[in-house]
Amino acid sequence: MKGMILAAGKGTRIKPISYAIPKPMVPILGKPVMESMIQLFAKHGIDKIVINTSHLAEIIENYFGDGHHFNVQLSYSYEATEVNGKFVSQALGSAGGMRKVQDFSGFFDETFVVVCGDAWIDLDLKKAVEHHKSHGGLATIITREVPSSEVSKYGVVVTDKYEQVVSFQEKPLESEALSNKINTGIYIFEPAIFDFIPKDVEFDIGSDLFPLLVERKAHFYAVNMDFQWLDVGKVKDVWEVTSDILNGKVKGYPIPGTQLAPGVWVGINTQIDISKCKITPPVIISSGCEVQDGATIIGPAVVGANCKVDAKSLVSNTLICDYIHLANDAYIVNKTMFGDYLLGHDGYTQLLADCLYVHILKNRNVSRPLMGRSSINDIYSTLAPKANPVPLQQVK
C-alpha cells in the first residue's frame, strides 16, 4: 500500500526550533516525531512512501535515506522554485504537494493514506482504511473526539447521520461548536481526488480541498476513531508531550535506556551513581552523560545525550538538548534547551550563549541534526542583540 507524509512546512509556529530543523524532525525522547509515523506505516503494510519536503529538506533526506532501515521504500518530492540558477524552497500546500507527485509519476494509483509529519499516533491504519472502503467514498478524514472544553484549540468536523462531512469550524468557541470531533491530519483518498486539485498552484487540503468537496457534495466522509494523538505543532507542545510520556499519560511510547530505579532511566556509557545524586522521578538521563555526585535532577526531566551535569547544579521540569555542560550553580527550572536556545515554558526565549553556567560543547565531531547545534549559526547572530551574560538564576 502507498502513503504520503507531509513535511514541507516552514514550522512557523515552532520557531526558533525550526530555524535549525524542520518540524517533523523535532525529537521526542531522542527520536524524530516523523520516524514514529514511518514505523507506523510499516507496521500496517504501507511500505511505499513519498515525503514532500521544502524547508531544510536535506536534514530529512539525510536522516531517513531510502527507508531500508525502516523496511519501507522512501522517495522525496522537493518543493522549490528556481531563481537565478538556484533552487529556493517554496511549498505548494499539502494538496498541491500531492498533485506535484501525481503529475510527476502517477504514484497514487490505488487507495492511499496521507498524514502530517509532526504528530505521533497509535492509530490502527488498516482498520481506518477498511472504514474508508466500506463507505465507497472518494475521501475520508479520521477524526477524534475531544472534551467540549477543548474544541476551541482545533479544527472541528461536522457530519450528518451517515458520517458524510457537511461543514468545518476552525477553532470555534465551545458555545458555538457543532461537534466535538476534530481533524487529526490523517486522510485516506482515492486517485480520483486529483480531479479536484488544480495543477501548479498552492492548494491546501484543509482550507481549499475539503471545502471544495463539501461544496460539490462529493463522497467525503469522516470516521471517528479512538486512538492516542500527540501533536508537536508548537514550541510548548514539545515539552508537554515529553512530560506526558514521562508521567505515564501516554501508553506504548518506548522510553529509552535502562530503568535503574522506579521512574529513572539511564542510557548506556553514562557515568552516574544515582545513590549519590538527588533524583526525583520521572527522569531520563541519556547515553554518554556524566552526572557528578550531588547533582539535583527533579522530574519530569530529560538530560540529552553526551551532557555533563556538575555537582552543584539543579535541573527541574526541564528538557535539555544533547552536548550541554551544566556547570556548578546552574539552576534550570521549567525550561526547554534546544539547539542554541533556552526556551521557557511560559514563552520566554534566550540564547544559550548569553547564559552563565551553561556551556555548549562546541568541539564535538558529530552529525546529529536532532538536538545539538545546527550548521546555521550565521542565522542565530541576527536573531537577538548581544547582551551581557545573565545568570540562570535570574532567567524568568
Predicted regions: what is each one?
Residues H135-E145:
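A short, conserved acidic/glycine-rich loop-to-beta-strand motif
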Residues T111-V113, W120, K126-K133, V146-S149, ...:
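Catalytic-core segments of class I nucleotidyltransferases/pyrophosphorylases
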Residues K10, G117-A119:
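Active-site metal-binding loops of divalent metal-dependent hydrolases
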Residues S77-E79, I142, V223-M225:
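Conserved beta-strand termini and adjacent loop/short-helix elements that scaffold enzyme active sites
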Residues T258-V390:
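Structural signal for interior beta-strand "rungs" in well-ordered beta-sheet cores
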Residues K2-I5, L29-C116, L125-K127, T159, ...:
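Conserved N-terminal catalytic core of the sugar/cofactor nucleotidyltransferase
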Residues M1-A20, A42:
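N-terminal nucleotide-binding beta1-loop-alpha1 segment
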